Amino acid sequence: MNIPPELTFEVLVRLPLKSLARFRSVRKEWKLVIDSEFFRDCFMSHNSSSVSWSIIQTRPHKLTLEIVGHHGCKTWGLTRSPGSLVGFFADTTIKRLRVLACTDGLVLIYTETSYGTPMHYVGNPLFQEWCPIPLPSYFYLQSVERIRNHQRFNDSALVIKMQSGAVVSYKVVWLFPRNSTTIDFLIYSSDTGMWEARIATCLHSSFWFSHHKPIALNGILHWLCNFSTSFVAYDFYGGHDDYACHIISFPDCEKDDDQLRRFRRTLSTSDGSIVYFNEFGENGNRRLRVWRLVKYTGGPEAWQLFWEVSLASVTKLGIDYFPVVMHPLKSEIIYLWSRNKKGMVLFNLRTNVFSLHKESEDETKCMDGCTLSFNRCSEYMETIHNYGGPNYLLASQYVLPRWLHRLPRPQPS
């Protein structure tokens, strides 16, 4: 029976990506429809409100990587959280495996064979596609030993180039602080399959790097530092004209704001931007301020204050909390961890409505319509609460893309 093309289109565009991936491999006609730009644009316009994502912790060698998962959204139609889908199957015996970075649906992992050979892979866990990343041909023996001895995990990162909602390129980045003013980058590109060495200027680079894992967004890596009121950013897809890192001051680095600020500084991402948030107390009032990074400069014009709300609705319940992340798509939702309630508070900044979700409870629906699940989240939150320093990356997000994409691979020469 021949199905009219118009009906095929209307049926397919209402299916989740999980089903589209299966139908795409069944019939050539369906594949042609799904792969068209018009179909992709229609699908994304119908599914712009929610997507599966995870809150991941920054110490994966101590606990599980995913501490909070979101699944069951309309876009993907997953019945499990994204973190539970991260699996790796090798042809040889693996004695050690570690997830180094997650961004835009791709994962960078480190493995070590039973013979002690270190290997890195970039993969798409949903489709079980993995690409081995070769070591640079000029890599020194002592550098390999540093990898084997687990001294290079905070220095590894993954940046992505997106186009029309799909990943078209990625870069694996290794960092080697050289001295107080320069940093060496080793960069592997999926476009060329080659490594590139790059030297960038950065003030006090030995203090910036290796202390925290970076946050990747739009091909840019962002690093916090415990010793400064600023953070560092570097654009790996910005061309070769600018070899300098951007040093960006936090919007509350003035003395008066610093005295009123309650929490350590941290960064998150939301709605395509880097965001910074904190609580400020003045005259007995507690208010939450959220800034969006709009320019990669060092002055006050770098930030836009787009939320300032009273915390009376939260604090009247006696909730002792600290901020964790923003919702990656909905910039009005912030995630707070309540220590005395031992649960995650989802606070809507627009409506001042909040909901409390406990790890001990069954999976529940959250504000974006996804199903919320926990995995040793309470244990991790108690651990990081005791960490010192004025700045700290508490957690980051692993967000699945809004469209199907295969793993980018180098073009054959």
Curated annotation (Swiss-Prot):
Signal peptide start and end residues: none
InterPro entries per record: At3g26010-like_b-prop, F-box-like_dom_sf, F-box_dom, SCF_F-box_component
Top-rank taxon, per record: Eukaryota
Coiled-coil intervals: none
Positions of the F-box domain: 1-42
PANTHER family: BNACNNG10540D PROTEIN (PTHR31672), F-BOX PROTEIN CPR30-LIKE (PTHR31672:SF13)
Protein name in UniProt: Putative F-box protein At3g23970
Organism: Arabidopsis thaliana
